[in-house]
A protein has these predicted regions:
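Beta->alpha loop/short-helix hinge microenvironment recognizer with preference
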Residues: 1-401
Length: 401
Protein backbone atom coordinates (compact mmCIF):
# COMPACT_ATOMS: atom_id res chain seq x y z
CA UNK A 1 0.00 0.00 0.00
CA UNK A 2 1.09 3.54 -0.61
CA UNK A 3 0.83 6.15 2.08
CA UNK A 4 -0.60 9.60 1.55
CA UNK A 5 0.29 12.46 3.84
CA UNK A 6 -2.49 13.75 6.06
CA UNK A 7 -1.15 17.25 5.92
CA UNK A 8 -0.04 17.38 2.31
CA UNK A 9 -0.34 20.81 0.70
CA UNK A 10 -3.17 21.45 -1.73
CA UNK A 11 -6.95 21.73 -1.49
CA UNK A 12 -8.75 18.93 0.29
CA UNK A 13 -12.50 18.35 -0.13
CA UNK A 14 -14.55 19.41 2.88
CA UNK A 15 -16.66 16.26 2.63
CA UNK A 16 -15.78 12.74 1.56
CA UNK A 17 -17.63 9.60 0.55
CA UNK A 18 -16.09 8.05 3.66
CA UNK A 19 -18.18 10.47 5.76
CA UNK A 20 -21.38 9.00 4.30
CA UNK A 21 -20.08 5.46 4.80
CA UNK A 22 -19.40 6.25 8.47
CA UNK A 23 -22.90 7.73 8.84
CA UNK A 24 -24.99 4.85 7.54
CA UNK A 25 -22.74 2.09 6.18
CA UNK A 26 -23.40 -0.19 9.16
CA UNK A 27 -27.14 0.39 8.80
CA UNK A 28 -27.01 -0.60 5.15
CA UNK A 29 -24.99 -3.72 5.99
CA UNK A 30 -27.45 -4.74 8.72
CA UNK A 31 -30.31 -4.50 6.24
CA UNK A 32 -28.74 -7.55 4.58
CA UNK A 33 -29.08 -6.41 0.98
CA UNK A 34 -25.40 -5.93 0.16
CA UNK A 35 -23.15 -8.39 -1.61
CA UNK A 36 -19.85 -9.41 -0.04
CA UNK A 37 -18.04 -7.19 -2.56
CA UNK A 38 -20.19 -4.17 -1.72
CA UNK A 39 -19.49 -4.66 2.00
CA UNK A 40 -15.78 -4.96 1.25
CA UNK A 41 -15.79 -1.70 -0.74
CA UNK A 42 -17.61 0.26 1.98
CA UNK A 43 -15.17 -1.01 4.58
CA UNK A 44 -12.18 -0.08 2.42
CA UNK A 45 -13.46 3.44 1.73
CA UNK A 46 -14.21 3.99 5.42
CA UNK A 47 -10.65 3.03 6.42
CA UNK A 48 -8.72 4.60 3.53
CA UNK A 49 -5.88 6.84 4.71
CA UNK A 50 -6.69 6.36 8.38
CA UNK A 51 -4.69 4.85 11.22
CA UNK A 52 -6.68 1.62 10.78
CA UNK A 53 -4.60 0.80 7.69
CA UNK A 54 -1.30 1.78 9.26
CA UNK A 55 1.26 3.99 7.61
CA UNK A 56 4.38 5.89 8.50
CA UNK A 57 5.52 9.11 10.11
CA UNK A 58 7.48 11.51 7.90
CA UNK A 59 10.07 13.23 10.10
CA UNK A 60 12.35 16.07 9.04
CA UNK A 61 15.90 15.18 9.99
CA UNK A 62 16.83 18.89 10.13
CA UNK A 63 14.07 20.55 12.19
CA UNK A 64 12.11 17.61 13.64
CA UNK A 65 8.80 18.44 11.91
CA UNK A 66 6.46 15.40 11.88
CA UNK A 67 3.69 14.51 9.43
CA UNK A 68 1.69 11.26 9.60
CA UNK A 69 1.01 9.49 6.30
CA UNK A 70 -1.58 6.71 6.31
CA UNK A 71 -1.91 3.91 3.80
CA UNK A 72 -4.44 4.02 0.97
CA UNK A 73 -6.98 1.23 0.51
CA UNK A 74 -6.24 1.11 -3.27
CA UNK A 75 -9.77 -0.07 -3.99
CA UNK A 76 -10.81 0.81 -7.54
CA UNK A 77 -14.12 2.24 -6.26
CA UNK A 78 -12.46 4.64 -3.80
CA UNK A 79 -12.50 8.29 -4.90
CA UNK A 80 -9.16 8.93 -3.17
CA UNK A 81 -7.24 6.12 -4.87
CA UNK A 82 -7.67 6.67 -8.62
CA UNK A 83 -5.11 9.31 -9.61
CA UNK A 84 -1.94 7.21 -9.37
CA UNK A 85 -3.62 4.13 -10.89
CA UNK A 86 -4.90 6.23 -13.77
CA UNK A 87 -1.50 7.82 -14.37
CA UNK A 88 0.26 4.43 -14.45
CA UNK A 89 -2.36 3.03 -16.84
CA UNK A 90 -2.01 5.98 -19.21
CA UNK A 91 1.76 5.68 -19.26
CA UNK A 92 1.42 2.04 -20.35
CA UNK A 93 -1.17 2.83 -23.03
CA UNK A 94 0.22 6.00 -24.60
CA UNK A 95 2.61 4.23 -26.98
CA UNK A 96 -0.28 2.21 -28.45
CA UNK A 97 -2.36 5.22 -29.50
CA UNK A 98 -2.37 5.58 -33.30
CA UNK A 99 -1.74 9.06 -34.78
CA UNK A 100 -5.18 9.38 -36.40
CA UNK A 101 -8.44 11.10 -35.55
CA UNK A 102 -10.69 9.10 -33.22
CA UNK A 103 -14.43 8.88 -32.57
CA UNK A 104 -16.27 8.57 -29.26
CA UNK A 105 -19.14 6.05 -29.45
CA UNK A 106 -21.49 5.33 -26.53
CA UNK A 107 -23.67 2.19 -26.32
CA UNK A 108 -26.49 2.49 -23.77
CA UNK A 109 -28.73 -0.33 -22.52
CA UNK A 110 -32.48 0.43 -22.50
CA UNK A 111 -34.02 1.27 -19.12
CA UNK A 112 -36.23 -1.84 -19.35
CA UNK A 113 -33.15 -4.05 -19.00
CA UNK A 114 -31.79 -2.42 -15.83
CA UNK A 115 -33.50 -4.79 -13.33
CA UNK A 116 -32.14 -7.75 -15.32
CA UNK A 117 -28.66 -6.20 -15.36
CA UNK A 118 -28.69 -5.66 -11.58
CA UNK A 119 -29.64 -9.31 -11.04
CA UNK A 120 -26.99 -10.57 -13.51
CA UNK A 121 -24.36 -7.84 -13.42
CA UNK A 122 -21.30 -9.88 -14.37
CA UNK A 123 -22.98 -11.68 -17.30
CA UNK A 124 -24.75 -8.60 -18.62
CA UNK A 125 -21.75 -6.29 -18.34
CA UNK A 126 -19.71 -8.91 -20.21
CA UNK A 127 -22.48 -9.07 -22.82
CA UNK A 128 -22.33 -5.30 -23.28
CA UNK A 129 -18.58 -5.60 -23.93
CA UNK A 130 -19.13 -8.54 -26.29
CA UNK A 131 -21.79 -6.86 -28.45
CA UNK A 132 -20.95 -3.14 -28.61
CA UNK A 133 -17.36 -3.40 -29.90
CA UNK A 134 -18.31 -6.40 -32.07
CA UNK A 135 -20.90 -4.22 -33.83
CA UNK A 136 -18.24 -1.61 -34.58
CA UNK A 137 -15.77 -4.22 -35.84
CA UNK A 138 -18.39 -5.85 -38.07
CA UNK A 139 -19.38 -2.60 -39.78
CA UNK A 140 -15.72 -1.64 -40.19
CA UNK A 141 -14.90 -4.95 -41.87
CA UNK A 142 -17.65 -4.44 -44.48
CA UNK A 143 -15.91 -3.48 -47.77
CA UNK A 144 -18.86 -1.23 -48.61
CA UNK A 145 -18.13 0.87 -45.51
CA UNK A 146 -14.45 0.77 -44.55
CA UNK A 147 -13.05 -2.66 -45.38
CA UNK A 148 -10.54 -2.78 -42.56
CA UNK A 149 -9.89 -3.65 -38.94
CA UNK A 150 -10.28 -0.73 -36.53
CA UNK A 151 -9.01 -0.29 -32.98
CA UNK A 152 -11.45 0.08 -30.07
CA UNK A 153 -10.89 0.87 -26.40
CA UNK A 154 -14.07 0.32 -24.36
CA UNK A 155 -14.75 1.58 -20.82
CA UNK A 156 -17.78 0.54 -18.74
CA UNK A 157 -19.67 3.20 -16.80
CA UNK A 158 -22.83 2.35 -14.85
CA UNK A 159 -24.03 5.70 -13.47
CA UNK A 160 -25.74 8.97 -14.23
CA UNK A 161 -24.60 12.17 -12.56
CA UNK A 162 -27.27 11.68 -9.87
CA UNK A 163 -25.84 8.17 -9.19
CA UNK A 164 -28.85 6.52 -10.82
CA UNK A 165 -28.16 3.14 -12.43
CA UNK A 166 -27.42 3.68 -16.12
CA UNK A 167 -25.08 1.05 -17.66
CA UNK A 168 -23.36 2.21 -20.84
CA UNK A 169 -20.14 1.63 -22.71
CA UNK A 170 -17.79 4.41 -23.83
CA UNK A 171 -15.74 3.41 -26.87
CA UNK A 172 -12.79 5.28 -28.35
CA UNK A 173 -12.58 4.20 -32.00
CA UNK A 174 -9.83 4.80 -34.54
CA UNK A 175 -10.91 6.87 -37.53
CA UNK A 176 -9.76 4.23 -39.97
CA UNK A 177 -8.72 0.61 -40.27
CA UNK A 178 -6.09 -1.74 -41.68
CA UNK A 179 -7.08 -4.07 -44.52
CA UNK A 180 -5.72 -7.55 -45.25
CA UNK A 181 -3.01 -6.14 -47.54
CA UNK A 182 -1.63 -3.86 -44.85
CA UNK A 183 -3.16 -0.70 -46.33
CA UNK A 184 -4.72 1.95 -44.07
CA UNK A 185 -8.23 3.18 -44.92
CA UNK A 186 -9.29 6.40 -43.19
CA UNK A 187 -12.90 7.25 -42.45
CA UNK A 188 -14.43 10.49 -43.60
CA UNK A 189 -13.29 13.33 -41.31
CA UNK A 190 -16.56 13.66 -39.36
CA UNK A 191 -18.39 10.41 -40.08
CA UNK A 192 -17.83 6.89 -38.78
CA UNK A 193 -20.97 4.77 -39.37
CA UNK A 194 -24.72 5.53 -39.51
CA UNK A 195 -25.84 5.47 -35.87
CA UNK A 196 -29.23 3.89 -36.75
CA UNK A 197 -27.51 1.00 -38.51
CA UNK A 198 -25.07 0.64 -35.61
CA UNK A 199 -27.94 0.73 -33.09
CA UNK A 200 -29.90 -1.98 -34.92
CA UNK A 201 -26.85 -4.23 -35.15
CA UNK A 202 -26.06 -3.74 -31.45
CA UNK A 203 -29.69 -4.40 -30.50
CA UNK A 204 -29.84 -7.61 -32.52
CA UNK A 205 -26.57 -8.98 -31.15
CA UNK A 206 -27.43 -8.26 -27.52
CA UNK A 207 -31.02 -9.53 -27.60
CA UNK A 208 -30.02 -12.69 -29.46
CA UNK A 209 -27.36 -13.33 -26.81
CA UNK A 210 -29.94 -12.75 -24.05
CA UNK A 211 -32.25 -15.34 -25.61
CA UNK A 212 -29.41 -17.86 -25.69
CA UNK A 213 -28.55 -17.22 -22.04
CA UNK A 214 -32.20 -17.61 -21.09
CA UNK A 215 -32.52 -20.87 -23.05
CA UNK A 216 -29.49 -22.27 -21.19
CA UNK A 217 -30.89 -21.25 -17.80
CA UNK A 218 -28.02 -18.82 -17.15
CA UNK A 219 -30.10 -15.79 -16.11
CA UNK A 220 -31.54 -14.80 -12.73
CA UNK A 221 -34.97 -13.37 -13.57
CA UNK A 222 -36.16 -10.71 -11.10
CA UNK A 223 -39.82 -10.02 -10.32
CA UNK A 224 -42.35 -10.81 -13.01
CA UNK A 225 -39.62 -11.76 -15.50
CA UNK A 226 -39.59 -15.20 -13.90
CA UNK A 227 -42.56 -15.96 -16.12
CA UNK A 228 -41.44 -17.19 -19.55
CA UNK A 229 -44.12 -15.21 -21.36
CA UNK A 230 -43.10 -12.00 -19.57
CA UNK A 231 -39.46 -12.46 -20.58
CA UNK A 232 -40.36 -13.12 -24.23
CA UNK A 233 -42.69 -10.11 -24.26
CA UNK A 234 -39.91 -7.90 -22.89
CA UNK A 235 -37.47 -8.96 -25.60
CA UNK A 236 -40.13 -8.57 -28.29
CA UNK A 237 -40.81 -5.00 -27.13
CA UNK A 238 -37.10 -4.23 -27.14
CA UNK A 239 -36.69 -5.60 -30.68
CA UNK A 240 -39.15 -2.93 -31.85
CA UNK A 241 -37.55 -0.09 -29.89
CA UNK A 242 -34.77 2.17 -31.16
CA UNK A 243 -31.64 1.71 -29.06
CA UNK A 244 -29.55 4.70 -28.16
CA UNK A 245 -26.11 4.73 -29.75
CA UNK A 246 -24.32 8.05 -29.71
CA UNK A 247 -21.35 8.94 -31.88
CA UNK A 248 -19.58 12.18 -31.07
CA UNK A 249 -17.66 14.08 -33.73
CA UNK A 250 -14.01 13.09 -33.80
CA UNK A 251 -11.41 14.65 -31.62
CA UNK A 252 -7.87 15.12 -32.90
CA UNK A 253 -4.90 12.82 -32.93
CA UNK A 254 -2.92 11.05 -30.27
CA UNK A 255 -2.63 13.99 -27.86
CA UNK A 256 -6.41 14.48 -27.74
CA UNK A 257 -7.05 10.76 -27.25
CA UNK A 258 -4.48 10.62 -24.46
CA UNK A 259 -6.20 13.52 -22.66
CA UNK A 260 -9.65 12.02 -23.22
CA UNK A 261 -8.69 8.62 -21.83
CA UNK A 262 -7.30 10.39 -18.79
CA UNK A 263 -10.78 11.74 -18.04
CA UNK A 264 -12.71 8.51 -18.52
CA UNK A 265 -10.72 5.39 -17.70
CA UNK A 266 -10.64 5.47 -13.90
CA UNK A 267 -13.69 7.61 -13.22
CA UNK A 268 -16.05 6.32 -10.53
CA UNK A 269 -19.68 7.15 -9.70
CA UNK A 270 -18.86 10.27 -7.71
CA UNK A 271 -15.78 12.22 -6.68
CA UNK A 272 -15.32 13.81 -3.27
CA UNK A 273 -15.11 17.24 -4.89
CA UNK A 274 -18.78 16.97 -5.92
CA UNK A 275 -20.00 16.55 -2.33
CA UNK A 276 -21.37 19.89 -1.09
CA UNK A 277 -22.81 18.87 2.28
CA UNK A 278 -23.03 15.69 4.35
CA UNK A 279 -25.22 15.44 7.45
CA UNK A 280 -27.44 12.90 9.17
CA UNK A 281 -30.40 14.36 7.30
CA UNK A 282 -29.11 14.68 3.75
CA UNK A 283 -26.26 14.44 1.28
CA UNK A 284 -26.11 17.34 -1.17
CA UNK A 285 -23.96 16.87 -4.26
CA UNK A 286 -23.33 18.52 -7.59
CA UNK A 287 -24.81 16.87 -10.67
CA UNK A 288 -24.34 19.19 -13.64
CA UNK A 289 -23.29 22.70 -12.73
CA UNK A 290 -25.14 24.60 -11.38
CA UNK A 291 -27.57 21.77 -10.61
CA UNK A 292 -27.44 19.79 -7.39
CA UNK A 293 -29.23 16.76 -5.94
CA UNK A 294 -30.23 16.04 -2.34
CA UNK A 295 -30.72 12.51 -1.01
CA UNK A 296 -31.05 10.89 2.42
CA UNK A 297 -27.62 9.43 3.33
CA UNK A 298 -28.84 5.84 3.18
CA UNK A 299 -30.39 6.33 -0.26
CA UNK A 300 -27.22 8.04 -1.48
CA UNK A 301 -25.02 5.19 -0.25
CA UNK A 302 -27.39 2.55 -1.64
CA UNK A 303 -27.12 4.20 -5.05
CA UNK A 304 -23.34 4.31 -4.79
CA UNK A 305 -22.99 0.58 -4.06
CA UNK A 306 -25.13 -0.19 -7.12
CA UNK A 307 -22.00 0.70 -9.09
CA UNK A 308 -19.64 -1.69 -7.33
CA UNK A 309 -18.33 -4.05 -10.00
CA UNK A 310 -18.14 -7.83 -9.60
CA UNK A 311 -14.80 -9.03 -8.17
CA UNK A 312 -11.94 -8.97 -10.71
CA UNK A 313 -14.24 -7.72 -13.46
CA UNK A 314 -12.21 -5.92 -16.14
CA UNK A 315 -13.87 -2.60 -16.93
CA UNK A 316 -11.41 -1.38 -19.60
CA UNK A 317 -10.98 -3.63 -22.65
CA UNK A 318 -9.34 -3.37 -26.06
CA UNK A 319 -10.48 -4.79 -29.39
CA UNK A 320 -9.40 -5.07 -33.01
CA UNK A 321 -6.01 -3.50 -33.66
CA UNK A 322 -5.70 -2.61 -29.97
CA UNK A 323 -6.36 -6.14 -28.66
CA UNK A 324 -3.42 -7.54 -26.71
CA UNK A 325 -2.82 -10.26 -29.32
CA UNK A 326 -2.39 -7.63 -32.05
CA UNK A 327 0.03 -5.27 -30.30
CA UNK A 328 3.18 -6.68 -31.92
CA UNK A 329 1.50 -7.66 -35.18
CA UNK A 330 -1.43 -5.80 -36.70
CA UNK A 331 -1.02 -2.68 -34.55
CA UNK A 332 2.65 -2.37 -35.49
CA UNK A 333 1.69 -2.94 -39.13
CA UNK A 334 -0.89 -0.15 -38.92
CA UNK A 335 1.70 2.21 -37.47
CA UNK A 336 4.06 1.45 -40.36
CA UNK A 337 1.26 2.02 -42.86
CA UNK A 338 0.56 5.42 -41.33
CA UNK A 339 4.19 6.48 -41.57
CA UNK A 340 6.41 8.35 -39.10
CA UNK A 341 4.48 10.30 -36.49
CA UNK A 342 4.77 11.76 -33.05
CA UNK A 343 3.25 9.75 -30.20
CA UNK A 344 1.48 11.72 -27.47
CA UNK A 345 3.94 12.95 -24.90
CA UNK A 346 3.05 13.08 -21.21
CA UNK A 347 3.22 16.38 -19.38
CA UNK A 348 6.80 17.08 -18.33
CA UNK A 349 7.63 16.36 -14.72
CA UNK A 350 8.65 19.25 -12.48
CA UNK A 351 12.37 19.92 -12.17
CA UNK A 352 13.96 17.44 -9.81
CA UNK A 353 16.27 19.87 -8.04
CA UNK A 354 19.56 18.52 -6.70
CA UNK A 355 18.35 14.91 -6.56
CA UNK A 356 17.04 13.22 -9.69
CA UNK A 357 13.32 12.43 -9.34
CA UNK A 358 14.01 9.00 -10.84
CA UNK A 359 15.79 8.07 -7.62
CA UNK A 360 12.56 8.52 -5.66
CA UNK A 361 10.23 5.59 -4.96
CA UNK A 362 7.63 5.19 -7.69
CA UNK A 363 4.67 6.60 -5.74
CA UNK A 364 6.68 9.68 -4.65
CA UNK A 365 7.80 10.34 -8.21
CA UNK A 366 4.26 9.98 -9.60
CA UNK A 367 2.83 12.19 -6.85
CA UNK A 368 5.35 14.84 -7.82
CA UNK A 369 4.52 14.54 -11.53
CA UNK A 370 0.79 14.88 -10.83
CA UNK A 371 0.86 17.66 -8.23
CA UNK A 372 4.23 19.36 -8.47
CA UNK A 373 4.70 18.64 -4.76
CA UNK A 374 7.84 16.92 -3.49
CA UNK A 375 6.86 14.97 -0.39
CA UNK A 376 10.50 14.78 0.68
CA UNK A 377 10.61 18.56 1.23
CA UNK A 378 9.88 19.68 4.78
CA UNK A 379 6.87 22.09 4.80
CA UNK A 380 8.42 24.01 7.71
CA UNK A 381 12.14 24.42 6.98
CA UNK A 382 12.02 23.41 3.27
CA UNK A 383 14.99 21.07 3.66
CA UNK A 384 14.96 17.96 1.50
CA UNK A 385 15.16 15.88 4.65
CA UNK A 386 11.82 14.11 5.26
CA UNK A 387 12.38 10.45 6.06
CA UNK A 388 9.76 7.79 6.91
CA UNK A 389 9.42 5.97 10.22
CA UNK A 390 6.89 3.18 10.84
CA UNK A 391 3.54 3.85 12.48
CA UNK A 392 1.67 1.05 14.25
CA UNK A 393 -1.66 0.02 12.80
CA UNK A 394 -4.59 1.07 14.99
CA UNK A 395 -6.30 -1.82 16.75
CA UNK A 396 -9.83 -2.57 15.65
CA UNK A 397 -12.63 -4.26 17.54
CA UNK A 398 -13.40 -7.65 16.12
CA UNK A 399 -16.03 -7.44 13.40
CA UNK A 400 -19.31 -9.30 13.92
CA UNK A 401 -19.67 -12.55 11.98
Amino acid sequence: MHAAPCGAPGPRPRFELADVAHLCGDELVRAGRLTAEQRKVLRAISRCRTAELGGHLDVCEDCGYERPAYNSCRDRHCPKCQALAQHRWLQRRRERILPVHHFHVVFTLPAELRPLVKANSERLYALLFATGPASLLELAADPARLGGEIGVTAVLHTWRRDLGFHPHLHCVVTGGGLDGRGQWHATRPRFLFPVRVLGKLFRGKLLDALRRLYARGKLVLPGSLGDADAFDELLDRLYHKSWLVYCKPPFGGADAVYAYLGRYTHRIGISNSRLLDVSKRAVVFRTRSPRTATLPPRVFLARFVDHVLPPRFVRIRHYGLLASGNVNGRLAQARRALGPSRVAEPAPAPEAGHDDARDQPDHLRLYRELTGIDLRLCPRCHARAMSPRPLPRAKQPRAPP
